[in-house]
Each structure stands twice: as C-alpha cells, then as structure tokens.
C-alpha cells in the first residue's frame, strides 16, 4: 500500500498495490487486507497470505526496531480467506492501519532454514517494480527496473517507475556528502544550516553557474533552529531578563 499525505491538512489517502482492498473496523480495532490475485514476487511466484503473515511476524519480532514498537500493539494476525489477512490491535488505534499497510512483504520460502537476523548480502525477493541489482557494502546499492513487474499495468502505476536503474550512494556523514556536492558528484543538496547557507556557497560550482542556490517554498511542517527560554526556570521568570538576552543576542555573528 502506498500512502499519499497532504502535510498542510494532515490527511492521508492510500494507493493499493499488493492489496486489492483494505477494510478498517468502525472502532479502529482491526484492519483487513485482501491480496490481488495477480500479485507476484519478482521471481514469478504468487504472493500468498502465508507470505504476508510470515513477513509481519518476522519483521515485527526480528526486524528493524521501527517495526517492533508497532508490532507490540498488534494482538493477533490471522487469515480470513484465501487472499485475506486481518490484524487485530490490542486497542482501537487510528494510526496502525496506516502503519501496517506500509510493511514490506517478503517471500517466506526464501528464508526457510536461515537465520533472518543474521547479517547477509543476499538480496530479499520482493514484489515491487525494482529488484536489487548491485551492492557495494558501505558505499552504494542500485536497483534495476523489473521488466516483468506484475503491477506495471495497474492504473495507479501510470507515469511512474521511469528509470531503468536507481542508485543510492552512502556517505559517512553530512560533511562528506556536502563535499561530494561541491565536487559535482551529488546533484541536489538540501541545506539545513543558516550559517552554511550564508557563508559556504562560494565554491566554483556555484560561482561559475553550474549550480543554483535557491529557496523552494513548501507547506510541509518543519522544526526550528533557535534558542527557547524555559520560563519555569526562575532565571528567566522576569520578562526584562528575557528581553535583555534578546537584545544581546548577536544573530549575524552566530549565523
């Protein structure tokens, strides 16, 4: 399931891929997914309810920590039909139906007799439009478009998956990635530091016009970078003290 969110209104809608339908209980106590009959893994084998249940249970107990917290709020998972699976929550939950719809589904047979939690460079068999192509441990991973992707003709897939190969390069830290951008190895950079924005963009890529420094307005929620005075602290209780600190704050020097 792919979820599309309008961050300005905090409303999300879903595009169903593996699932043909999704049903949520009126009291938000459970969510039920029905698989598309034509859903296939990249090796051509069908995606089954057993694969779905195994994926949820395995990722929820042995997968990335971000899966564990959500799984702890699931009371049980069960097949309700040859292509349907229901997850019942420990208590009514408005968020879990969305989170459960984002779980990757893996092929159970690929992992039989193996330790799922063990480190491995074996590429998992998935059901998406791309398959793992090449891996350079610690440096990069590339995905190749699957010409036999089962869902390529779904209406919701029109106009997407237009690249033959997608590559992700890894950097040890943000400074290394910024240096790669300055050298032209990275084509887009999102600057989060007001200080860098104002003082560190005089490198050749910018001065000769090969790169453009621009502000792109958007309506996504964002955090702040600044100082916040805790008025519950007696030191900041007097408004005149807070005003004095504001007057003393050298914004230009710090930024």
Model-derived features with residue positions:
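Extracytoplasmic
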Residues: 17-19, 26-30, 47, 72-74, ...
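Surface-exposed binding/hinge segments that line
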Residues: 23-27, 34, 68-111, 129-136, ...
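Extracellular/periplasmic solute-recognition and catalytic clefts
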Residues: 59, 76-78, 133-144, 169-233, ...
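A structural "hinge/loop" feature
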Residues: 8, 14-20, 45, 67, ...
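Gly/Pro-rich hinge or "lid" segments in bacterial periplasmic/extracellular proteins
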Residues: 101-160, 164-165, 172-176
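Solvent-exposed coil/turn segments that connect beta secondary-structure elements
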Residues: 27-29, 36-38, 52, 57, ...
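N-terminal lobe/hinge region of extracytoplasmic solute-binding protein
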Residues: 2, 8-26, 57, 125
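Aromatic- and charge-enriched surface segment that lines or borders ligand/interaction sites
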Residues: 20-65, 80, 86, 170-171, ...
């Amino acid at each position: 399931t792919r979820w599309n969110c309008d961050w300005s209104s905090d409303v999300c809608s879903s595009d169903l891929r593996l699932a043909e339908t999704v049903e949520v209980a009126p009291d938000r106590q459970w969510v039920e997914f029905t698989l598309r009959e034509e859903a296939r893994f990249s090796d051509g084998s069908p995606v089954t309810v057993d694969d779905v249940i195994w994926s949820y249970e395995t990722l929820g107990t042995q997968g990335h920590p971000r899966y564990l917290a959500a799984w702890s709020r699931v009371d049980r998972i069960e097949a309700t039909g040859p292509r349907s699976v229901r997850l019942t929550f420990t208590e009514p939950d408005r968020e879990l139906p969305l989170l459960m719809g984002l779980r990757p589904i893996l092929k159970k047979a690929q992992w039989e007799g193996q330790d799922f939690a063990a480190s491995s460079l074996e590429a998992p068999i998935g059901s998406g439009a791309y398959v793992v192509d090449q891996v350079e441990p610690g440096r990069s991973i590339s995905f190749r478009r699957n010409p036999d992707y089962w869902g390529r003709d779904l209406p919701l897939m029109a106009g997407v998956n237009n690249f033959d190969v997608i590559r992700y390069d890894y950097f040890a830290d943000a400074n290394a990635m910024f240096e790669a951008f300055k050298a032209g190895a990275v084509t887009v950079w999102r600057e989060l530091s007001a200080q860098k924005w104002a003082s560190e963009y005089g490198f050749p890529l910018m001065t000769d016009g090969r790169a453009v420094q621009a502000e792109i307005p958007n309506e996504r929620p964002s955090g702040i970078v600044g100082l916040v005075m805790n008025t519950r602290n007696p030191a900041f209780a007097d408004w005149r003290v807070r005003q004095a600190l504001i007057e003393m704050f050298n914004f230009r020097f710090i930024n």
